[in-house]
């Protein structure tokens, strides 16, 4: 079973930002995507990348509550376990 790691999420977020700078996720449980410079479009690009890479559907209506990298990890990994 595949699982999304914090390092993988960090790289996907860097790609979504379109920058060489990698976001610092030291406080992944409290820092928001907005604090990291990701607007809603960048978060959507991150979600789309995860869906393509991991072959999992992440329902948009449930994503509204996902505001931090840590909550994204939990959200994605729960879906991956359910799909296994």
Curated annotation (Swiss-Prot):
A GO BP term here is: daunorubicin biosynthetic process
Matching entries from SMART domains are given as: PKS_PP
Known pathway: Antibiotic biosynthesis; daunorubicin biosynthesis; Antibiotic biosynthesis; carminomycin biosynthesis; Antibiotic biosynthesis; rhodomycin biosynthesis; Antibiotic biosynthesis; aclacinomycin biosynthesis
Q: Name one GO molecular function term.
A: phosphopantetheine binding
The reply on keyword Metal-binding is no
Q: Does the keyword Transit peptide apply?
A: no
Which controlled-vocabulary keywords does the entry list? Antibiotic biosynthesis, Phosphopantetheine, Phosphoprotein
Q: Which residues carry this modification: O-(pantetheine 4'-phosphoryl)serine?
A: 40
Which InterPro entries does the record match to this protein? ACP-like_sf, PKS_PP-bd, PP-bd_ACP, Ppantetheine_attach_site
Q: Which PROSITE patterns match?
A: CARRIER (PS50075), PHOSPHOPANTETHEINE (PS00012)
Q: What does this protein do?
A: Involved in the biosynthesis of aklanonate which is an important precursor common to the formation of the clinically significant anthracyclines such as carminomycin, daunorubicin (daunomycin), rhodomycin, aclacinomycin T (aklavin) and aclacinomycin A (aclarubicin). These compounds are aromatic polyketide antibiotics that exhibit high cytotoxicity and are widely applied in the chemotherapy of a variety of cancers.
Task: Supply the name of the protein.
Answer: Anthracycline acyl carrier protein DpsG
- This protein's species is Streptomyces peucetius
């Amino acid at each position: 079973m595949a699982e999304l790691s914090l390092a993988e999420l960090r790289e996907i977020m860097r790609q979504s930002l379109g920058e060489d700078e990698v976001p610092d996720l030291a406080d992944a449980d409290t820092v928001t995507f907005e604090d990291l410079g990701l607007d809603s479009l960048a978060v959507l690009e991150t979600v789309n990348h995860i869906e393509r890479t991991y072959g999992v559907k992440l329902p948009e209506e449930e994503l509204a509550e996902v505001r931090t990298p840590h909550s994204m990890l939990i959200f994605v990994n729960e879906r991956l376990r359910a799909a296994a």
